[in-house]
Amino acid sequence: MIIKPRVRGFICVTTHPAGCEANVKQQIDYVEAKGPVVNGPKKVLVIGSSTGYGLAARITAAFGSGADTLGVFFERPGSESKPGTAGWYNSAAFEKFAHEKGLYARSINGDAFSDEVKRLTIETIKRDLGKVDLVVYSLAAPRRTHPKTGEVFSSTLKPIGKSVSFRGLDTDKEVIKDVVLEAASDQEVADTVAVMGGEDWQMWIDALLEADVLADGAKTTAFTYLGEKITHDIYWNGSIGAAKKDLDQKVLGIRDRLAPLGGDARVSVLKAVVTQASSAIPMMPLYLSLLFKVMKEQGTHEGCIEQVDGLYRESLYGAEPRLDEEGRLRADYKELQPEVQSRVEELWDKVTNENLYELTDFAGYKSEFLNLFGFEVAGVDYEQDVDPDVQIANLIQA
């Protein structure tokens, strides 16, 4: 079938398999051009491996370090009449290219919050890999069913303590609008922490330790975003921030648990990028459009693969990791440079419907957004017939 983009709000409801494959190939080419990651990982588990930063972490491990990788995700395949999710096509493409290189690559499709998926993962590691030396935790989910109680929690994106008004960008209508977000209730904050905080990461590491499938010196990292003051009210100081602060607490216990193995656990701070998760945050499209404009002018613009490749080389496996006073690994330093943030702030209030394309890089934002779903990827002929029914060989279905 011929597949065209159909965007509804902050999601594109169609995806393009050939575009997703080309997108994955571009990321692989970027990593390979950088050469090997010195002393990089060899057997890697990526929890949340199908899109965005998790996919970039899997690509960097495999193609920067020659690592065998096991990926966990929750995606939907295509059929003859309907495309699957982008993460499905990304993972199929990743495995295809990894197998061509002679690398082990397998995937588990199911709910990573569940005990069943943890059990299947451990069985697969024992059978195929023995032990893993890196565990990347990169889940972004709107809800979580607690594996012990069955309780269902939903995450909320709201400020804490007070309602907040700010400028936003309606990406459908392409207009600047004022948005008001009401303050989260205590319950909403607690539920958001239950979904996006560190409990599940801790459960994963506990399960892997108990099963004795973590190698000596094993590392684990979970990804976070801090941002600067423009986004603080609704992000770092809001309900999502409460969950991210929970990661900062939980990592201390995880680090202690890994100490007997000579291992380490770190939260890694990455820059703001276009992902399916970030496009749902009301102020992010405007912030990202301005950030892209400023960072491209300065020659420092980066996407997921540049960020994660740099994180591996500089910090996770670098001789002098970039650590902050909280012990987090930092890859977001270019975004937070004072000259970048002050310029974004200066332009923030000047943007109007009339000068949107002039003052911001909304065009670049839109293009990167469509790239997520396999559209507007260089070198892909979108008039060609494609088969949306793409298989992932040896997929383990939970």
From Swiss-Prot:
One of its GO terms (biological process) is fatty acid biosynthetic process. Keywords: Fatty acid biosynthesis, Fatty acid metabolism, Lipid biosynthesis, Lipid metabolism, NAD, Oxidoreductase. Pfam families: Eno-Rase_FAD_bd, Eno-Rase_NADH_b, Enoyl_reductase. Gene3D superfamilies: NAD(P)-binding Rossmann-like Domain. NAD(+) binds at residues 48-53, 74-75, 111-112, 139-140, 244, 273-275. It catalyses: a 2,3-saturated acyl-[ACP] + NAD(+) = a (2E)-enoyl-[ACP] + NADH + H(+). InterPro entries: Eno_Rdtase_FAD-bd_dom, Enoyl-CoA_Rdtase_cat_dom, FabV-like_NADH_b, Trans-2-enoyl-CoA_reductase. Substrate binds at residue 225. The keyword Glycosyltransferase does not apply. The record marks 75 as: Plays an important role in discriminating NADH against NADPH. PANTHER family: ENOYL-[ACYL-CARRIER-PROTEIN] REDUCTASE [NADH]. This is Enoyl-[acyl-carrier-protein] reductase [NADH]. It comes from Pseudomonas paraeruginosa (strain DSM 24068 / PA7) (Pseudomonas aeruginosa (strain PA7)). The lineage of its organism: Bacteria, Pseudomonadati, Pseudomonadota, Gammaproteobacteria, Pseudomonadales. The gene is fabV.
